[in-house]
């Protein structure tokens, strides 16, 4: 069986930075406990590995007040920093630089009098965090129905969750532009997301089956699944680990494409490839 790996897959810069930050804190923790405020990234295997090394996940600052609290790669609302400062909690910021850029944009343009529109999932921690940098006043749109609920406004500033699909951004932005005579657009989908999506789409056209490796709660992985299903609706499979590969299905085909989300470590991708090669 022929196994082809997408040109762009696996860890992105922001995820690598967050994990490196966490392990550097382990080296210099000075006997303090280390926590992450929410899962550092959306990959359960990596989170388990961090926990095995003593880095625990907490859901609020107070639970980590006796140690060092690492801000997750998805970022957090602005008031978290203020809260930590007032409580004298030691924070280490592992926010993805691309996410931090969006936070700065919405903070700046809200102060300039713009209404902020975030294209993304309102329940995703990245979007929740971004909204917290414009006083939680953003219009968050996930689909056309959400756009219809936006009134006509004087000034609009549009940003996007870093992991949405480019097609969704293009479609919804065109609609949002009809809601104001003065619209600023910032395509804040990160380059790693675009590269992975294009690479996955091209590979799906060339193979019989697509395997997408990544966390079930990972937004960017879910987008890869959606894109591949457009090309291979019946033979696209989303897995987290090599143990979930549908081997009984793969044996009926000649070629398999493998790609992975931005929070999927190389060792998991390698395990998947090895298992398919041994079919």
UniProtKB/Swiss-Prot annotation:
Pfam families documented for this protein: LYTB
Residues binding [4Fe-4S] cluster: 12, 96, 190
CDD domains: lytB_ispH (cd13944)
Active-site feature positions: 126 (proton donor)
GO BP terms in the entry: dimethylallyl diphosphate biosynthetic process; isopentenyl diphosphate biosynthetic process, methylerythritol 4-phosphate pathway; terpenoid biosynthetic process
Residue sites binding isopentenyl diphosphate per the record: 42, 74, 124, 218-220, 263
InterPro entries (UniProt xref): LytB/IspH
The protein's enzyme class: oxidoreductase
Residues engaged in binding (2E)-4-hydroxy-3-methylbut-2-enyl diphosphate: 42, 74, 124, 162, 218-220, 263
Catalytic activity from the UniProt record: isopentenyl diphosphate + 2 oxidized [2Fe-2S]-[ferredoxin] + H2O = (2E)-4-hydroxy-3-methylbut-2-enyl diphosphate + 2 reduced [2Fe-2S]-[ferredoxin] + 2 H(+); dimethylallyl diphosphate + 2 oxidized [2Fe-2S]-[ferredoxin] + H2O = (2E)-4-hydroxy-3-methylbut-2-enyl diphosphate + 2 reduced [2Fe-2S]-[ferredoxin] + 2 H(+)
Binding residues for dimethylallyl diphosphate: 42, 74, 124, 218-220, 263
GO MF entries: 4 iron, 4 sulfur cluster binding; 4-hydroxy-3-methylbut-2-enyl diphosphate reductase activity; metal ion binding
Cofactor (UniProt): [4Fe-4S] cluster
Keyword hit for GTP-binding: no
EC number: 1.17.7.4
Pathway: Isoprenoid biosynthesis; dimethylallyl diphosphate biosynthesis; dimethylallyl diphosphate from (2E)-4-hydroxy-3-methylbutenyl diphosphate: step 1/1; Isoprenoid biosynthesis; isopentenyl diphosphate biosynthesis via DXP pathway; isopentenyl diphosphate from 1-deoxy-D-xylulose 5-phosphate: step 6/6
Top-level taxon in the UniProt lineage: Bacteria
Keywords linked to the UniProt accession: 4Fe-4S, Iron, Iron-sulfur, Isoprene biosynthesis, Metal-binding, Oxidoreductase
Free-text function comment from the UniProt entry: Catalyzes the conversion of 1-hydroxy-2-methyl-2-(E)-butenyl 4-diphosphate (HMBPP) into a mixture of isopentenyl diphosphate (IPP) and dimethylallyl diphosphate (DMAPP). Acts in the terminal step of the DOXP/MEP pathway for isoprenoid precursor biosynthesis.
UniProt cross-references to NCBIfam families, sorted A to Z: ispH_lytB, PRK01045.1-1, PRK12360.1
Family: Belongs to the IspH family.
Name of the protein in its database record: 4-hydroxy-3-methylbut-2-enyl diphosphate reductase
Source species taxonomy: Bacteria, Bacillati, Bacillota, Clostridia, Peptostreptococcales
């Amino acid at each position: 069986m022929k196994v082809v790996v997408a040109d762009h897959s696996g860890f992105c810069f922001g995820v690598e930075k967050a994990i490196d930050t966490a392990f550097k804190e382990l080296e210099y923790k000075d006997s303090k406990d280390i926590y992450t405020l929410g899962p550092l990234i959306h990959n359960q295997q990596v989170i388990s590995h961090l926990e095995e090394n003593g880095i625990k996940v907490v859901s609020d600052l107070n639970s980590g007040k006796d140690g060092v609290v690492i801000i997750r790669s998805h970022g957090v609302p602005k008031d978290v920093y203020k809260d930590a400062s007032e409580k004298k909690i030691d924070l280490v910021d592992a926010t993805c630089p691309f996410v931090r850029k969006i936070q700065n944009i919405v903070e700046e343009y809200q102060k300039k009098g713009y209404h902020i529109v975030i294209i993304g999932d309102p329940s995703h921690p990245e979007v929740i965090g971004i909204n917290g940098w414009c006083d939680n006043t953003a219009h968050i749109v996930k689909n056309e129905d959400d756009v219809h609920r936006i009134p006509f406004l004087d000034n609009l500033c549009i940003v996007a969750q870093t992991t949405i699909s480019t097609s969704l951004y293009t479609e919804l932005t065109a609609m949002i532009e009809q809601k104001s005579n003065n619209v600023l657009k910032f395509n804040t989908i990160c380059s790693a997301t675009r590269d992975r999506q294009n690479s996955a789409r091209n590979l799906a056209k060339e193979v019989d089956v697509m395997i997408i490796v990544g966390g079930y709660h990972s937004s960017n992985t879910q987008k890869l699944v959606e894109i591949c299903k457009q090309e291979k609706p019946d033979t696209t499979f989303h897995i987290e680990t090599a143990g979930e590969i549908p081997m009984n299905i793969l044996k009926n085909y000649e070629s398999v494409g493998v790609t992975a989300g931005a929070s999927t470590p190389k060792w998991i991708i390698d395990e998947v490839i090895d298992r398919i090669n041994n079919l």
